[in-house]
Amino acid sequence: MRERTKNAFSFLFLQKGGWLVMTKETKLERDFQSKLIKELKKIFVGCLVMKLDSSYIQGIPDLLILYNNKWATLECKKSAKASKRPNQDYYVGLMNKMSFSRFICPENKEEVLNELQQTFKT
């Protein structure tokens, strides 16, 4: 009898410049990011949330939040244990020195959003 394993799946999408592989893990992060954007817009009424292009600058955080005269970036991860891409630590650290930047995942979401609220209040 064959041993059962978890099913892993992926999708291939043709995009300008080549193929994009969409894995189950990528979908989990995308779903988390989508819900997070809705929550950010609810908390910070009138803010702009923009997705940044990591193919332009490798390691740049996923989201830029503009609110009144302040800004922040967030790098979304599907879990606290998710791997980081090259340069992500560098850019999150650099942008945190400039304003506010964090890695955010379901496990630390409330803590990060509370910190962001404090930053946007000052």
Where are these regions (language model features)?
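Catalytic phosphate/metal-binding cores of nucleic-acid and nucleotide-processing enzymes, i.e., regions
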Residues: 2-122
